[in-house]
């Protein structure tokens, strides 16, 4: 089972974006985020919500960039 990591206040372009990642751990979610978006600082300062024990394959689930 993986966890869902819901990241808010990321991918900012005037307004905040959001990313959802399924991963075994926060460290694994960070690796997925940095590989896709090349922005470790964005991950490190994100607002997190974690939903534990979901039946979803590891990886990037969904994302939306902020915009204005």
Name each model-derived stretch:
Residues 15-24:
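A short, exposed loop/beta-hairpin motif centered on an aromatic-Gly-Thr core
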Residues 1-16:
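Short aromatic-glycine-(Arg/Gly/Cys) micro-motifs in beta-strand/loop hairpins
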Residues 35-68:
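Short, mixed-charge low-complexity intrinsically disordered segments
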Residues 5, 21, 62-63:
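A broad, low-specificity signal marking well-ordered, structured residues that form hydrophobic/aromatic
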Residues 11, 27-29, 55:
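Intrinsically disordered, low-complexity segments enriched in glycine/proline and serine/threonine
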Residues 1, 23-29:
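A short, structured loop/turn motif at beta-sheet edges
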């Amino acid at each position: 089972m993986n966890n869902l990591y819901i990241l808010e206040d990321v991918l900012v372009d005037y307004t905040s974006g959001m990313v959802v990642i399924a991963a075994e751990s926060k460290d694994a979610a960070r690796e997925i985020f940095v590989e896709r978006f090349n922005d470790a600082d964005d991950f490190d300062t994100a607002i997190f919500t974690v939903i534990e024990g979901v039946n979803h394959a590891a990886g990037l689930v969904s994302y939306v960039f902020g915009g204005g």
